[in-house]
């Protein structure tokens, strides 16, 4: 809700959960870009459930299928908003980051202007941190 910190974050990466992206100001002068990390629902839901539980939200008690449906609709809504606002957004599959970090680093670097150290970006990926692995369905696609 308070995005007054955003101008000070210029030139930095900031992790923001998808549900909070619509709260970012729609001011083109800020010039921010979004790298939207995509993961299969089955990998995302356990952490979503934990977060909802910590916040005391009712969604923590929903059955997996219902929570998945709610989360999928939230992601679709966020993507529609980003597309409508014409915020530059690059969709990146988490699995691709783990499987081929150099290729993903090159894509992200190109998207962000080409001034980043791709080798350092690729080396920073630690496949051992890939928790909650699943072979499930990915998040809904970005709108064209």
Q: Over which residues does each language-model region extend?
A:
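Conserved substrate/cofactor phosphate-moiety recognition/catalytic segment
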Residues: 1-14
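PAPS-dependent sulfotransferase catalytic core
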Residues: 1-2, 121-144
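PAPS-dependent sulfotransferase catalytic domain
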Residues: 11, 17-117
């Amino acid at each position: 809700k308070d995005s007054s910190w955003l101008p000070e974050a210029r030139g930095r990466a900031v992790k923001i959960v998808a549900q909070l992206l619509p709260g970012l100001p729609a001011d083109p002068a800020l010039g921010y870009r979004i790298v939207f990390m995509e993961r299969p629902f089955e990998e995302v839901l356990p952490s979503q459930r934990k977060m909802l539980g910590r916040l005391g939200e009712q969604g923590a008690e929903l059955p997996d299928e219902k929570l998945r449906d709610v989360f999928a609709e939230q992601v679709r809504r966020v993507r529609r908003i980003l597309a409508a606002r014409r915020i530059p957004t690059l969709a990146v599959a988490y699995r691709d980051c783990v499987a081929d970090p150099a290729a993903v680093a090159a894509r992200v670097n190109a998207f962000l202007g080409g001034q980043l150290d791709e080798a350092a970006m690729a080396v920073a990926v630690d496949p051992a941190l890939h928790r909650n692995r699943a072979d499930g369905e990915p998040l809904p696609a970005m709108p064209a």
